[in-house]
Design a protein with these regions (language model features):
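Hydrophobic alpha-helical segments at protein termini of multi-pass membrane proteins
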Residues: 1-110
């Protein structure tokens, strides 16, 4: 069973959501931190930035959010395997909304 929306498979849309969310949040945070009035309030992100691990963590998160569901989708063939795509979709949406918030802060800082 191939699930699709407007000709795009749900699987590819899930991976694109994760990619757009993680990359968008990372870039908007980097840009936002260039402004003196904007500070990072997430203590985990502050810890990662102070130790030079922030980019590595986001790259690993992107790899896991795409790699693990892709592996599971190909390893098992039962119909419920589509549920694993909730992980990259939800992660991508959460990071996408963080990106929107960051852009909002950047615009307000002008």
């Amino acid at each position: 069973m191939d699930l699709s929306i407007y000709g795009y498979s749900i699987e590819s849309l899930a991976y694109l959501t994760a990619l757009a969310g993680i990359v968008g949040d990372h870039l908007s945070t980097r840009i936002g931190l260039l402004y003196p009035m904007i500070r990072e309030m997430n203590p985990f992100t502050v810890f990662l930035r102070q130790n030079g691990l922030w980019l590595l963590f986001d790259v690993l998160m992107l790899g896991v959010s795409i790699g693990v569901p892709a592996l599971l989708m190909r390893k098992w063939s039962f119909n419920g395997r589509w549920a694993v795509l909730a992980f990259p979709i939800l992660l991508g949406l959460a990071r996408f909304f963080a990106m929107v918030y960051n852009v909002f802060l950047i615009v307000l800082s002008f």
